[in-house]
Amino acid sequence: MAAVTLNVSTLKPLGDRVLVKIAQQDEKTAGGIFLPDTAKEKPQVGEVVAVGPGKRNDEGKLIPMELKAGDRVLYSKYAGTEVKLGSDEYVLLAERDILAIVQ
């Protein structure tokens, strides 16, 4: 079986799933103290990179997604599956795990 190279342009979420690029955290505090990775709070904000087509209701009708690529979102802290592509980190979430669009 051949190895597959993944990049963002080749990932298309299925159903009501959303691919979100995780926002980078500051490496140091406002007081200038550098934080080790173990002391950093897990980020809950990111930018939507790709969205699935939506999910189907009981009658089979497609319910379109409310999100679109480019939306900045707040999502549940422990939701989704984290994916690392190159040097960037992403999280694959179900639409229900998105709490809000950040304006």
From Swiss-Prot:
Molecular functions (GO terms): ATP binding; metal ion binding; protein folding chaperone; protein-folding chaperone binding; unfolded protein binding
Subunit annotation: Heptamer of 7 subunits arranged in a ring. Interacts with the chaperonin GroEL.
The protein, known as: Co-chaperonin GroES
Disulfide bridge partners, by residue number: none
GO CC field: cytoplasm
Entry keywords, A to Z: Chaperone, Cytoplasm
PROSITE patterns found in the cross-reference section: CHAPERONINS_CPN10 (PS00681)
SUPFAM superfamilies, sorted: GroES-like
NCBIfam families in the cross-refs: PRK00364.1-2, PRK00364.1-6, PRK00364.2-2, PRK00364.2-4, PRK00364.2-5
Compartments, as annotated in UniProt: Cytoplasm
